[in-house]
């Protein structure tokens, strides 16, 4: 049976700009939405312009001092915040840019609203490609991330769900989410990422397993350069299958960072768009309520292709290999296809022996789990908002203009293949 899919897109989120030459480009969200729109995928989803998160919402996880700083600081007054900039790790990699707090409010609100709708059974799957900023910590920014929308969304899910499983397929370790839930068995975190050679953020060893009540509820899959579709699948599917079997989550949050694709400007993996999408499709196959988020991804045209393809998988709608014409069509030159060859010459350093060793260690750790930890019954806290689906127009009756307002960001357009030539060592 087809799932009900809610899709969250803020038409202004693509306007924000981290600064000249910065690898993180919110404009990729406008490209993604444009493809979703022109493929007609919006007809298969309930489309929402999302809620904007308040300071109070953000302080569910972050410190009040940090969030107050994010709201107050701007490029024009930042000289007066020198001490705070250092204290909160805001600077080169996490710059102060115009509308910083508003940007955080928009992507965080969408994840929070997605979680609320899953709680209220308005949808089976909620999609927020603007979210997934997994490095942000309680007291500081990190790796292009300011507010950890994932943690805030999971905290909302925990009002209704006894056990939430978090899966991260970004090339970078999901350190902010792991740190937030390191001591609890209510959330199990599973991260597949590049590890070693001082690769950011430097955490995510296989032996980081959680502590106290959360011991063995943190699972890391450290990978080496050049992993391809076959090797990734050899680990991903059996590991996730075992985790779901042992943990029995009642909800899943999936972070779909697209920097694990081949040809990503800041990545070193060799996944194809189909291989990346196969992970999403596999997680969907468990038929467990699912919050799908974005994350990293720095070759803009491939990020848009990847997340559009994964949207099509989530709504179970086949789409053509030829990209539909749109205002961003020239971004996808010279092939104008959905699945270009993104393989690189990076050698796959993940031998079958190495992958089998990881899998064996992970399975041994899973045996240490108590099956499906129980939660004491108590009153459910008030939800974020109350939704009435009758307020939504039928997808077939909505025109594209009701679902999409094109952002205009003249300073955000694609600068060519060398606009950020791997000089930064901090990424999502």
Swiss-Prot record:
Binding of 1D-myo-inositol 1,4,5,6-tetrakisphosphate, residues: 17, 21, 25, 265
Chain positions recorded as Zn(2+) binding sites: 170, 172, 259
A Pfam family it matches: Hist_deacetyl
CDD domains: HDAC3
Modifications made to the protein after synthesis: Deubiquitinated on 'Lys-63'-linked ubiquitin chains by USP38; leading to a decreased level of histone acetylation. Sumoylated in vitro.
Keyword Transcription found: yes
Biased composition (Basic and acidic residues): 388-405, 415-428
Protein's recorded name: Histone deacetylase 3
UniProt organism field: Pongo abelii
């Amino acid at each position: 049976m087809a799932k009900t899919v809610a899709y969250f897109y803020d038409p202004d989120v693509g306007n924000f700009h981290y600064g000249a030459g910065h690898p993180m480009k919110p404009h990729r969200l406008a490209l993604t939405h444009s493809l979703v729109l022109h493929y007609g995928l919006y007809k298969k989803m309930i489309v929402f312009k999302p809620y904007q998160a308040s300071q109070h919402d953000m302080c569910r996880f972050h410190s009040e001092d940090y969030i107050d700083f994010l709201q107050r600081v701007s490029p024009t007054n930042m000289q007066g915040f020198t001490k705070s900039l250092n204290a909160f790790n805001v600077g080169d990699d996490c710059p102060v840019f115009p509308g910083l707090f508003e940007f955080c409010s928009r992507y965080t609100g969408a994840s929070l609203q997605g979680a609320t709708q899953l709680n209220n059974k308005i949808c089976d799957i909620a999609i927020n490609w603007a979210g997934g900023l997994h490095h942000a910590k309680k007291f500081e920014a990190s790796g292009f991330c300011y507010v950890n929308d994932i943690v805030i969304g999971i905290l909302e899910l925990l009002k209704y769900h006894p056990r939430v499983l978090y899966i991260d397929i970004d090339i970078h370790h999901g350190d902010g989410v792991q740190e937030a839930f390191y001591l609890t068995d209510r959330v199990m975190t599973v991260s597949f990422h590049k590890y070693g050679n001082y690769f950011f953020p430097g955490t995510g060893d296989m032996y980081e397993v959680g502590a106290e009540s959360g011991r063995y509820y943190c699972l890391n899959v450290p990978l080496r350069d050049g992993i391809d579709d076959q090797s990734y699948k050899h680990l991903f599917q059996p590991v996730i299958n075992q985790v779901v079997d042992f943990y029995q989550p009642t909800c899943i949050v999936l972070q779909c960072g697209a920097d694990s694709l081949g040809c990503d400007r800041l990545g070193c993996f060799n996944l194809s768009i189909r291989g990346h999408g196969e992970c999403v499709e596999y997680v969907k196959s468990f038929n467990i309520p699912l919050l799908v988020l974005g994350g990293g991804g720095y070759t803009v045209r491939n990020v848009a292709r990847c997340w559009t393809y994964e949207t099509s998988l989530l709504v179970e709608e086949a789409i053509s290999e030829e990209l539909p014409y749109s205002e961003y069509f020239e971004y996808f030159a010279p092939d104008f296809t959905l699945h270009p060859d993104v393989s690189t010459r990076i050698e796959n350093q993940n031998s079958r022996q190495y992958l089998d060793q990881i899998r064996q260690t992970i399975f041994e750790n899973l045996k240490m789990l108590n099956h499906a930890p129980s939660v004491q019954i108590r009153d459910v806290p008030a939800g974020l908002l109350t939704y009435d689906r009758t307020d939504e127009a039928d997808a077939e009756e909505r025109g594209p203009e009701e679902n999409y307002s094109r952002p205009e960001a003249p300073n955000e357009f694609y600068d060519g293949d060398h606009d950020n030539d791997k000089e930064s060592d901090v990424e999502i």
